[in-house]
């Protein structure tokens, strides 16, 4: 289950996209405006996740999907193939249904491993 995922998520009629790295029970990710930090456990095939989403970009054109600059999301779901499908809710929007589909990104698209030379990495 550990790996890098693209994430499509929504609440009510709003939706967004992010990336998320899952590793050893931790969830780290985000997008252009919000960081997503959390944890997960797997019990009897069910994934239980808790995520805090927090604004890192003060641009007012990026609206918070959860109605606030900081929100706590709780969700449960299952891994099916290369996707994790979650459903839950956020503390900032009681009663609203939150969903997320995480699709694992193919490691085959990564560049080959190697050493970084004296000049480091440059653009």
What are these regions (language model features)?
Residues 1-13, 27, 86-88:
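Tryptophan-anchored aromatic micro-motifs
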Residues 2-4, 37, 46, 99:
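Exposed beta-strand and adjacent loop surfaces of beta-rich binding modules
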Residues 20-31:
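Short, flexible N-terminal segments of the mature chain
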